[in-house]
């Protein structure tokens, strides 16, 4: 696929996001399902598609830290905690950070924090930059199924109508590690 074709596909995916659709896209280890984090309709569609309870909360993936700032309470982090985050980004570490009071519950679930990551996958970087904000990010798989690692697997699990950003997953074998930004506690091994 040449760059011009990829841009056309990217433009279609951005258009789908603006129309509050759920999309699939390659990440560092698996394909992700994503949508506009500010659209309750899109998030509810994603949760229903994934068969995931809203109470668990979601992850936001971004091109840079500035895209995450409207959703997280950065003032709760001290300089050392912030430096620790920045030393792992862009990269496969997801950090749980206190959320802003106005961050929608459809993102935080039953928590007062939000899981966020600045991705180093070039297509995720490009997609978030083009869209202008982060995306909800959860692994593309139905409950009880393995996460999808190819476009074909996405089509098998979710059907042909789901918009999929063409591309390949990165070389990681495991999903992102998840850590608490305040305590350093590891919630999920990467």
From Swiss-Prot:
Its EC number is 2.7.7.87. The keyword 4Fe-4S does not apply. It is an enzyme of class 2 (transferase). GO terms for cellular component: cytoplasm. It is found in: Cytoplasm. GO terms for molecular function: ATP binding; double-stranded RNA binding; L-threonylcarbamoyladenylate synthase; nucleotidyltransferase activity; tRNA binding. Residues 7-190 form the YrdC-like domain. Keywords: ATP-binding, Cytoplasm, Nucleotide-binding, Nucleotidyltransferase, Transferase, tRNA processing. PROSITE patterns: YRDC. SUPFAM superfamilies: YrdC/RibB (SSF55821). It comes from the Bacteria. It catalyses: L-threonine + hydrogencarbonate + ATP = L-threonylcarbamoyladenylate + diphosphate + H2O. GO terms for biological process: regulation of translational fidelity; tRNA threonylcarbamoyladenosine modification. Belongs to the SUA5 family. TsaC subfamily. Required for the formation of a threonylcarbamoyl group on adenosine at position 37 (t(6)A37) in tRNAs that read codons beginning with adenine. Catalyzes the conversion of L-threonine, HCO(3)(-)/CO(2) and ATP to give threonylcarbamoyl-AMP (TC-AMP) as the acyladenylate intermediate, with the release of diphosphate. This is Threonylcarbamoyl-AMP synthase. It comes from Yersinia pestis.
